[in-house]
C-alpha cells in the first residue's frame, strides 16, 4: 500500500537491461501474500516498473540493476506468511551445486536448449520453463539444507574370514540382549507371582468366610429341625392324652347308667306299689297273712 499508481504485470521483456534489473521471489505463499503486499515490501529499494505474481513465486521489475541487487541483498531469506523467501536476480540463476546422493534433473540440463521457451499464460508471455526449473532447483536446494533423518546403516558384505568374528559379535550381542530380556522376564515373572499370591490370599479369605457362613446355616437348620421335632412330639403326646381322657370319660358314663336302673330300683317300685295297694285296700295285709 504505497499510494502510488498500480504497476503493470509485464515482467517478461527480453532486453538485457530489463533482465538484469529483474528480481525473482521464490517460496512465496501467494495464497496470503498479494501483489500489493509485494510492491509495498520491495518499493523501498527503488522504483518498481512491473510486478507479476504466480502460484508460489513472483517477479519484480526495477528501473535499474542497482535497485534490484539491493532488494535481493536486503530481502533474501525473509520470512513472510510463515515461509522464508528465496530471492535472486532473475537474469543470474542460482548456480547448481551438486551434492552427494543428489542427481541433477534433466530439465535443468536441457532448459536452455528448449525450442519453445516462451509460453503465453495469463495474457502475457514469459519464459516459463526457464524460471520454473530455476525456481524448483532453488526450492530443492533450500529443502536440502535441512538434514535428512538418519537412515539405517546396511552392513557391507565381508570376506568369509571375518564371518566368524561377526558371528561371535552377534552372539555376544544376542547373549547381552538375551540377558536383558531374561532380566525383564524375571521382573515380570516376579510381579506376576506377587499378584498371584495376593489373589490366592484373597481367595482363601473368601473361602473361609463362605465356610463359616455355611456352618452357621447348618447349625440354624439343625436347631430348626430339633424345634420342629420337639413341637411334633408335644402335639402327639397332647393328642394321646386327649384320647385317653375321652376314653375314660366314655367308660365312666357306661358304668354309671345300669346302676341307676337295676333290681333295687324295681324292688323299690314294687314295694311302693304294695304299700300303695295296702293303703288303698286296707285289708290286704290280712289276706296275705292268711295265705
Swiss-Prot record:
This is RNA-binding Raly-like protein. SMART domains: RRM (SM00360). The gene is RALYL. One of its GO terms (molecular function) is identical protein binding. The lineage of its organism: Eukaryota, Metazoa, Chordata, Craniata, Vertebrata. Belongs to the RRM HNRPC family. RALY subfamily. GO terms for cellular component: nucleoplasm; nucleus. Residues 190-249 form a coiled coil. Residues 257-282 have a biased composition (Acidic residues). Widely expressed, with highest levels in brain. Keywords: Coiled coil, RNA-binding. Residues 177-189 have a biased composition (Low complexity). Transmembrane segments: none annotated. Residues 21-92 form the RRM domain. Residues 171-192, 249-291 are annotated as: Disordered. It comes from the Eukaryota. It comes from Homo sapiens.
Amino acid at each position: 500500500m504505497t499510494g502510488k499508481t498500480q504497476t503493470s504485470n509485464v515482467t517478461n521483456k527480453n532486453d538485457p537491461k530489463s533482465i538484469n534489473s529483474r528480481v525473482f521471489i521464490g517460496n512465496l505463499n501467494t495464497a496470503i501474500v498479494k501483489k500489493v503486499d509485494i510492491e509495498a515490501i520491495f518499493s523501498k529499494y527503488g522504483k518498481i516498473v512491473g510486478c507479476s505474481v504466480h502460484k508460489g513465486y513472483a517477479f519484480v521489475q526495477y528501473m535499474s540493476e542497482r535497485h534490484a541487487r539491493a532488494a535481493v541483498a536486503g530481502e533474501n531469506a525473509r520470512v513472510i506468511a510463515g515461509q522464508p523467501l528465496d530471492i535472486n536476480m532473475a537474469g543470474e540463476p542460482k548456480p547448481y551445486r551438486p551434492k552427494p546422493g543428489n542427481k541433477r534433473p534433466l530439465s535443468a540440463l536441457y532448459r536452455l536448449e528448449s525450442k519453445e521457451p516462451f509460453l503465453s499464460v495469463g495474457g502475457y508471455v514469459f519464459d516459463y520453463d526457464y524460471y520454473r526449473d530455476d525456481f524448483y532447483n532453488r526450492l530443492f536446494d533450500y529443502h536440502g539444507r535441512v538434514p535428512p533423518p538418519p537412515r539405517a546403516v546396511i552392513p557391507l558384505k565381508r570376506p568369509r574370514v571375518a564371518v566368524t568374528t561377526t558371528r561371535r559379535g552377534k552372539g555376544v550381542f544376542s547373549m547381552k540382549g538375551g540377558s536383558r530380556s531374561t532380566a525383564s522376564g524375571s521382573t515380570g515373572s516376579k510381579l506376576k507371582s506377587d499378584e498371584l499370591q495376593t489373589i490366592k490370599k484373597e481367595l482363601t479369605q473368601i473361602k473361609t468366610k463362605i465356610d463359616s457362613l455355611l456352618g452357621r446355616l447348618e447349625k440354624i437348620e439343625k436347631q430348626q429341625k430339633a424345634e420342629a421335632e420337639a413341637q411334633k412330639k408335644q402335639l402327639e403326646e397332647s393328642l394321646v392324652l386327649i384320647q385317653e381322657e375321652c376314653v375314660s370319660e366314655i367308660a365312666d358314663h357306661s358304668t354309671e347308667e345300669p346302676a341307676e336302673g337295676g333290681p333295687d330300683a324295681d324292688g323299690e317300685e314294687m314295694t311302693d306299689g304294695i304299700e300303695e295297694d295296702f293303703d288303698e285296700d286296707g285289708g290286704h295285709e290280712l289276706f296275705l297273712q292268711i295265705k
